């Protein structure tokens, strides 16, 4: 069985990602669980790096709710900018346009600017899948609707936004579900900085270490018998306030 090196919720922390990828052997399948962008200081560098890994090394990058919000803003900036701003979007807009992170943003005009300046990165985000299913694992950003008769009918929106109903639901998929989205320190009721994963007896593994909130960036290697190796890179400076 192929091994998978999985990373979740980088949120613009390019330096932490570079450090974590030093542990990747180049042979295992590299999988990103979404939320490459927003809140951190260098979303553009993260997007460019991961795009290169997808194009040149066969990495797989799933969409997270922040990529979902980014595209929603681009497609309808007048209606959607405020919601995106409240979720850390200004950091990404400024990063993509080469401006200081705290530069003022025009939510409508800058949408056109982003489309023109980084069309390749926008296209990259648009083609991100929402789920990766293997013989043993389901990789997804936020989770699945486990109340459905067929979990595969989970909407794309739920795949990137769901929280408690998934966390509290019973995993009867027959597979291990690996997800991010909700920082593990919330799920574990601990302070930011814990390097523990959230593990359940029914086969759910939460691995958003809250890197941009002063936590860690997890890299987990999965194989036939579960977790083979795990890495946790500590926050390297900037801590998001929102």
Each language-model region and where it sits:
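N-terminal active-site segment of His-dependent metallophosphoesterases
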Residues: 1-49, 53-55, 59
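Divalent metal-coordination and catalytic microenvironments
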Residues: 9, 35, 50, 64-65, ...
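Short, glycine/acidic-enriched loop or turn micro-motifs at the edges of active sites
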Residues: 11-12, 38, 68, 144, ...
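Short, glycine/charged-enriched secondary-structure capping and boundary segments
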Residues: 19-23, 45-48, 75-78, 153-154, ...
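Active-site neighborhood of divalent metal-dependent phosphoester bond hydrolases
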Residues: 39-129
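Acidic, His/Gly-enriched loop-helix segments that form or flank divalent-metal centers
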Residues: 102-216, 222, 226-228, 233
């Amino acid at each position: 069985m192929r091994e998978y090196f999985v990373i979740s919720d980088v949120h613009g922390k390019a330096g932490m990602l570079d450090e974590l990828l030093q542990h990747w052997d180049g042979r295992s399948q590299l999988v990103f669980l979404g939320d490459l962008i927003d809140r951190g200081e260098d979303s553009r560098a993260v997007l460019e790096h991961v795009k290169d890994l997808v194009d040149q090394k066969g990495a797989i990058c799933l969409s997270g709710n922040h990529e979902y919000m980014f595209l929603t803003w681009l497609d309808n900036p007048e209606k959607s900018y405020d919601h995106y701003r409240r979720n850390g979007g200004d950091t990404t807009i400024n990063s993509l346009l080469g401006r200081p992170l705290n530069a003022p943003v025009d939510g409508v005009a800058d949408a056109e600017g982003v489309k023109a300046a980084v069309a390749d990165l926008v296209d990259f985000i648009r083609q991100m899948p929402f789920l990766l299913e293997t013989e043993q694992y389901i990789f997804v950003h936020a989770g699945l609707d486990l109340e459905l008769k067929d979990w595969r009918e989970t909407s794309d929106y739920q795949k990137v936004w769901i929280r408690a109903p998934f966390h509290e639901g019973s995993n009867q998929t027959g597979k291990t579900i690996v997800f991010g989205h909700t920082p593990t320190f919330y799920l574990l009721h601990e302070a930011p900085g814990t390097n523990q994963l959230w593990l359940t007896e029914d086969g759910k593994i939460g691995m958003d270490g809250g890197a941009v909130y002063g936590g860690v960036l997890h890299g987990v290697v999965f194989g036939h018998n579960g977790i083979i190796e795990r890495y946790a890179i500590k926050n390297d400076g900037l801590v998001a306030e929102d």
